[in-house]
A protein has these predicted regions:
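Short-chain dehydrogenase/reductase
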Residues: 86-87, 129, 133-145, 175-182, ...
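Conserved glycine-rich Rossmann-like NAD(P)H-binding loop of the short-chain dehydrogenase/reductase
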Residues: 25-34
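NAD(P)H-binding glycine-rich loop region in Rossmannoid oxidoreductase-like domains
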Residues: 49-88
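NAD(P)-dependent short-chain dehydrogenase/reductase
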Residues: 149-202, 207-211, 215-216
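N-terminal Rossmann NAD(P)H-binding glycine-rich loop of SDR-like oxidoreductase domains
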Residues: 3-23
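Conserved Rossmann-fold NAD(P)-dependent oxidoreductase catalytic core, especially the SDR/UDP-sugar
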Residues: 68-70, 94-136
Length: 226
């Protein structure tokens, strides 16, 4: 398969590059920056263009991807805690999906997260469960999922939204300390104890397992939704 990964450098995107290359697939990369400042694993072709570039359609046409994976919630190009980034996140996603729709090249996978749900839920969450995120980042992701659904239904785009539930990894850089496992370990180092909420249970997803799940969806021929 020909794979196009879209996103800033992070542990997840680099592990995806390693996985797809190991399985014999050709991987190309759209960094979202004019000048590549961050390190990535080696790929077949790297495109240093921003998401609002007029060249997006040309890039997708050149790569001719069987699968395009947008890092979405895990795209390090965005400052997710800042409200003014919301317009950028939405407009960039529209540009990317519009280019994918115009070129009609393969299917698209958008990575979202459990943050689109907030609070405790007595019943198991389903794909159709109403979204109830809280905070700036959650609002951005809910809007992004809405955009994805619009392109699914109204533009006929073969698009899958994958919500990665409490993703965690072993941090190698300070910027990797951004998930609950790492934050709890950091709290323990600073205070000597870990604070937990009583009667609050949730699952954790190891990054390597997430990579395997994403790979399985990528090679699956059927259409998916969320």
């Amino acid at each position: 398969m020909k794979i196009l990964l879209i996103g800033g450098s992070c542990s997840l995107i680099n592990n995806l590059i390693v996985k797809f290359k190991k399985e014999g697939h050709r991987v190309s990369l759209l960094t979202g920056e004019r000048y590549q400042k961050k390190k990535y694993e080696k790929v077949f072709e790297t495109y240093n263009f921003t998401y609002d570039s007029e060249k997006l359609s040309d890039i997708i046409d050149s790569v001719n991807p069987d699968v395009t994976i947008c890092m979405g919630a895990f795209d390090s190009n965005y400052r997710w805690k800042e409200e003014h980034e919301a317009v950028k996140v939405s407009s960039h996603l529209v540009n990317i999906l519009m280019a994918c729709t115009q070129e009609k090249k393969g299917k698209v996978i958008y990575l979202s997260s459990d943050e689109v749900y907030y609070g405790d839920h007595e019943e198991k969450l389903q794909e159709e469960s109403p979204l109830s995120g809280k905070g700036v980042r959650a609002s951005m992701l809910i809007q992004a999922e809405s955009i994805c659904q619009n392109f699914q239904k109204n533009w006929g785009l073969d698009l899958t939204v994958l919500r990665l539930d409490h993703l965690y990894n072993q941090p190698k850089r300070p910027e990797d300390v951004n998930h609950i496992g790492a934050l709890m370990c950091l709290e323990a180092l600073k205070t000597g104890c870990i604070t937990v909420q009583e009667n609050h249970d949730f699952s954790l997803l190891n990054e390597k397992d997430a990579v395997e799940f994403i790979y399985c969806i990528a090679k699956e021929p059927q259409k998916h939704e969320i």
